[in-house]
Amino acid sequence: MSSPTAAEIRRRFIEYFEGRLGHEVVPSSPVVPHEDPTLLFTNAGMVQFKDWFADTELASARRVVTVQRCMRAGGKHNDLDNVGQTARHHTLFEMLGNFSFSDADDAAALAAAASKGEPSPLKAEAISHAWTFLTEVLRLPPEKLMVTVHEDDAEAEHIWRDIIGLPAEQVVHGGEDNWWSMGAGAGPVGPCTEIFWDQEQEVDGERWLELWNLVFMEQLRDADGSLSPLPRPCVDTGMGLERVVSVLQSVRSQPLSSSQPLSS
């Protein structure tokens, strides 16, 4: 059986989240943001949803799936210096993403879970969806995947260990690399869990290739750096399409040949 192409992986991703899970498909926003003066280029799938993360009542859908064209050539996510130096970095790439914007029903479910000492349903949902897609839809061997969790995120570790069933050696604690924010200023922040693929040998000095980052926006950071609970927690995930293609096709690097005009 031949390895799936980038187009096939895109299709499977959308079909999984839209067809099986009921997410709403949102088209890629322009690589050059039209109404965001803080960015020269769109560098992540969550960019077009910034306002929704800040106020979930603005969200037109609770669950969303996208394939976002991204460029990282400056700012917080600047991959420009790594392009050509490693096989895994590209200036222009596509990010597969799914997002959850909690509403009153989610808030009630979160409160009920907390009262019972159970983990966040939003976290459990996001982790389960990602794991199922990788191991059942793409059929990646579970034993070749490893995850990281923030050292203080006992919920995520519990979900991976006790619900998904990963052994302890496949769940690694992290620090700053497992804490997400939009930048240095005010805005939503929270822990993240990352899923890595075992390349079995070092490639550009790295044995483990990061595939998917699942961000749990749980707190709001004020301008003075103080943290408070986010009234409506959200989930933001992103997975590099090119990296998934490289894994499934067993090649070191897979830049896509179907790039579209940047300013469309």
What are these language model-derived features?
Residues 1-264:
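Structured aminoacyl-transfer and RNA-binding surfaces used for tRNA recognition/handling
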